[in-house]
Amino acid sequence: MSWFALSFGAALTQATQFALVKGRARGIPPLVIVTWTQAIAAASWAAFFLVSGHAFALPRFAWPAVAVCAVLVMGMSGLLARASARGDISIVGPVFALSPIFTVLPDAALSGTWPSPLGWVGLSLSVLGTSTLSGSGTGWRGLAALFGRRDALDALGAALLLGLVAAVDRWGARTIGPASYLLGSHGATALLAGLIAVLTTPAGLAESVRVRNVVTLVGHGLLGAAGTGMQTTALTMAPAAYVNAIRRMSSVVAVLLGRALFAEPDLGRRLSAALLACAGAACRLLAGR
């Protein structure tokens, strides 16, 4: 399977997670959502090793990368969960699509890859699209108005962290293999988030075992495991900025789901912004050829 197909599959699971959190998990603390999601993903990869007979290997030199990834993923996933639950997913999706911008420097440092000139055009298109989301003009004025919204600001923070996560994931997956790296990183993130959840929101953690919440969290976790697996495998085939560029297509799906399921406003403007992000993704794809 090509890196494009894997990245697009990850985009679809991401948009579905946005909708699932807004529709069924608004009352669940973000840190609890992160704990469950990462634990289910770790269990899924552990099952893969048990069934397939593949050898798990996480050498000591990779431990720092796993630890860094755990901190970054906990922050990123927590911000995304909060933004999706409290805001408009048709805003969250397009803003989160800015993540390739924050991938460029760390990816260059860890993997030695830079965008081509056409790739830079793609990044510029995504910024232009994002600046129109607020309805207060374009450029800096539009961006300032947009990031006055809490959901947009949370999504921007998540996009920044995803840019860093993607670069670390690319290094880890290429160095020790996607499966071993993912089991290690998901497990570490689940332990870290779970410990902090026990200390800061024990009531929320206890409430999460109700049947309705369990169904929601397991579904969210399985989507996350599938999406992360597809993305990390794609990262072994292409630069992180290219993979994240295709994942930006989740912004279009998020806008459409937001309108269809939650009657979110400004469909035309938000869809235009998401389509500009996709145009940027197309530039990145062409630049990779």
Predicted feature descriptions by range:
Residues 164, 177-180:
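Generic multipass alpha-helical transmembrane bundles of integral membrane proteins
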Residues 15, 19, 46, 70-75, ...:
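Hydrophobic/small/kink-forming positions within alpha-helical transmembrane segments
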Residues 170-174, 236:
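Short amphipathic helix-loop junctions that connect adjacent transmembrane helices
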Residues 1-68, 75-87, 135-154, 187-220, ...:
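Membrane-interface interhelical linkers
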Residues 1-8, 101-160, 170, 265-289:
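Juxtamembrane helix-loop boundary signature in multi-pass membrane transporters
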Residues 68-73, 82-130, 182-191, 240-260:
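Specific alpha-helical transmembrane segments that line the substrate/conduction pathway
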